[in-house]
Amino acid sequence: REFLLDVAKENVRYMEVRFAPTCSINAHMTYRDVMEATLCGLEEARKECGTFYNVIVCCMRHFDLETNLAMLKGCREFLGEGVCAADLAGDEASWPMSRFGELFREARKLDYPYTIHAGECGSVQNIVDAIEAGASRIGHGVAMKGCLEVQKLCRDRHIGVETCPTSNLQTRAVTVLKDYPVREFLNNGILVSVNTDNRTVSGTTLTQELLALQNQGVIAEPETVILMENALE
């Protein structure tokens, strides 16, 4: 609830909230309980502030197949009723995409659209593998900076790329913001957007992300409009 009210103060009109429901279940809370509580809070906030939302449920790389599948099945009843997609997040260096083929075959059987965190740790192959696994969007994707072949793959398949500048600086996925590849991605026709990743951990907002890129000369104000249109698309 608080999260949606906070982003509404930035004039955000639609927000996709992602989290890992498995981290909230316990002996007294089922997946249904977790999702009902989450969606109830978001809906209360929507009625108060007018900002619309959807939830992306995250599988975690360090969870086994059985655990991740249990989450997808446990949240399936909410798909189209507040849940819009699934995701795979976590340490991609230790758990590369090559380990998750079966998970996403099962996700497709359950009719989940999905985005996948890939290319944050420096492995461009994870991006390729995520696309081949059926991802319609890539979280981060900065590893394909300078890799025109993979950028062309994203462009040709209309893959959304969800960049997160401050988070990437903090995790050392990039070293300096002035060289951040958003402009490169835009110039090469990629459907790129700017995101916060984790507002609380990174201590940022969407407004701060966009202003930081503008202040470093990475983008100009007209490109901010393009990035927002890409996010909406």
Model-assigned labels for residue ranges:
Residues 12-15, 49-55, 80-84, 110-112, ...:
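Short, well-ordered coil/turn segments that N-cap beta-strands
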Residues 115-121, 190-205:
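Short acidic/histidine-rich active-site segments
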Residues 32-36, 69-73, 98-104, 175-184:
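Charged helix-capping and loop-helix junction motifs
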Residues 84-97, 102-173:
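Active-site core of metal-dependent hydrolases
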Residues 1-18, 36-47, 162:
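Alpha-helical scaffold segments that flank or form the walls of functional sites
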Residues 3-27, 52-58, 84:
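Divalent metal-dependent hydrolysis catalytic cores, especially in the metallo-beta-lactamase
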Residues 218-233:
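Mid-to-C-terminal alpha-helical segments outside catalytic/metal-binding sites
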Residues 32-50, 101-115, 157-158, 162, ...:
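Alpha-helix-loop-beta-strand connector modules within alpha/beta enzyme cores
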